[in-house]
Every structure is written in structure tokens, then in C-alpha cells.
Amino acid sequence: GSGADCFWKYCV
């Protein structure tokens, strides 16, 4: 989504 939450290589 907006890049608000990132985990390892995944931003949502």
C-alpha cells in the first residue's frame, strides 16, 4: 500500500 509498514523486503 502506502509503504507505512515494512518487514524484511515487504512494504505495505
Curated annotation (Swiss-Prot):
The keyword Disulfide bond applies. GO terms for biological process: blood vessel diameter maintenance; regulation of blood pressure. Urotensin is found in the teleost caudal neurosecretory system. It has a suggested role in osmoregulation and as a corticotropin-releasing factor. This is Urotensin-2A. It comes from Catostomus commersonii (White sucker). Disulfide bonds join 6-11. Keywords: Disulfide bond, Hormone, Secreted. Pfam families: Urotensin_II. GO terms for molecular function: hormone activity.
